[in-house]
């Protein structure tokens, strides 16, 4: 039997006119599908694929984390930590060989690997552009995720496709002040051998 796993890192930021982060939201999608040695899918792909923030305590990291924090709590702690920093300062956050925080104040609230998030945050800062958001607007990140696939018929490859639709919005009360929409479509081929 085999496993197909797709991991998608999602970051949104707002920055001021000097490139300093004023707000940050971090999320991730981890989509998994199992298949057997005949290349038949074993996973029900009609089941929704929640993001790690949507999973919250159901992700199950809190019970095994050395600090007792769930993934979404650690992602929020990292997001809070980078507010007030530039892209270069985010990239300069000290990490160990596993890219886990090496700075004591961050390591007390974050034990997950952050290297990929550092890069994603810095890229988000570099790509930020004025779209209507104002100081004090609330930044939100929303995803709609799904999987689709086809079995691997004898001698041929099957395919699993993960679709992650993303909207990063800023809001002033009930009014949208800016919106960026993007998507990730990851395709993985497989057969009875893997």
How would you describe each model-predicted region?
Residues 1-194:
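Active-site- and interface-proximal helix/loop "cap" or "latch" segments in soluble metabolic
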């Amino acid at each position: 039997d085999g496993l197909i796993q797709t991991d998608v890192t999602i970051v949104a930021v707002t920055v001021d006119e000097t490139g300093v982060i004023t707000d940050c939201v971090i999320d991730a999608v981890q989509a998994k599908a199992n298949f057997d040695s005949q290349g038949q899918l074993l996973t029900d792909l009609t089941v929704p694929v929640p993001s790690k923030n949507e999973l919250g305590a159901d992700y199950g990291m809190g019970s095994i984390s050395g600090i007792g924090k769930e993934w979404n709590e650690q992602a929020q702690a990292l997001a809070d930590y980078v507010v007030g920093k530039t892209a270069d300062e985010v990239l300069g956050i000290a990490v160990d060989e596993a890219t886990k925080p090496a700075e004591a104040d961050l390591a007390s609230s974050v034990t997950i690997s952050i290297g990929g998030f550092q890069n994603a945050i810095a890229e988000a800062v570099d790509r930020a552009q004025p779209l209507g958001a104002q100081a004090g607007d609330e930044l939100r990140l929303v995803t709609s995720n799904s999987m689709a696939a086809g079995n691997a018929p004898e001698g041929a490859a099957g395919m699993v496709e993960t679709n992650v639709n993303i909207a990063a919005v800023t809001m002033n009360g009930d009014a949208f002040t800016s919106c960026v929409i993007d998507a990730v479509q990851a395709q993985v081929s497989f057969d009875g051998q893997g």
